[in-house]
Regions:
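Short, charged surface segments at domain edges that flank catalytic/cofactor-binding sites
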Residues: 1-33, 109-114
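Histidine-centered nuclease catalytic patch
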Residues: 33-66
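Conserved aromatic-histidine-acidic binding/catalytic patches
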Residues: 5, 9, 59, 77
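Short, flexible active-site loops
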Residues: 2-6, 52-55, 71
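Short flanking/linker segments adjacent to small metal-binding domains or redox-active Cys/His motifs
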Residues: 100-137
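Short Cys/His-centered divalent metal-binding micro-motifs
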Residues: 39-42, 67-94
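Short microdomains enriched in Cys/His and/or Lys/Arg
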Residues: 55-67, 91-105
Length: 137
């Protein structure tokens, strides 16, 4: 097997990070709630890792405070419900957090292959640990 491209590493990191966000917020049965509309669903079915600041900003793409569970309707068809998500973020992490994330998103970040590999290893291990703790697949 050859060396993975940065593009493939980014995609793999997205996968593990998304699973982490959804699993950490799930019940032991795997149920999560959309942070913007409250809809309930299984973390694997119709629920996604929504980003307050767009994924195009690498400085906040894998920032846990920038992400929360969203249903497909809110995340895709309602452009992420950014205003509602900002309220959720400020309620969860403290007033001004959403504004700080907006500033952070403007920073230019260049990740190396090692950065991606380390983050993949980190989130993959946490996902596996959460699955064991919650006894879900």
């Amino acid at each position: 097997m050859g060396v993975k491209t940065i593009s493939k590493l980014k995609k793999e990191l997205d996968k593990w990070f998304s699973l982490y966000i959804r699993l950490k917020l799930s019940t032991p049965e795997g149920i999560v709630s959309c942070c913007t509309c409250g809809k309930l669903g299984h973390y694997k079915v119709g629920m996604q890792n929504g980003h307050f600041q767009s994924r195009r900003h690498h400085s906040t793409r894998w920032n846990e405070q920038n992400c929360a569970v969203q249903c497909i309707a809110c995340n895709c068809f309602s452009q992420g419900e950014q205003y509602k998500m900002s309220i959720y973020i400020d309620n969860k992490y403290g007033k001004g957090t959403a504004e700080s994330l907006e500033m952070e998103a403007r920073k230019i970040v260049k990740m190396s292959r090692i950065d991606y590999e380390e983050k993949i290893t980190y989130y993959k291990s946490i996902v596996n640990k959460l699955k064991l703790e919650k006894n879900i697949e």
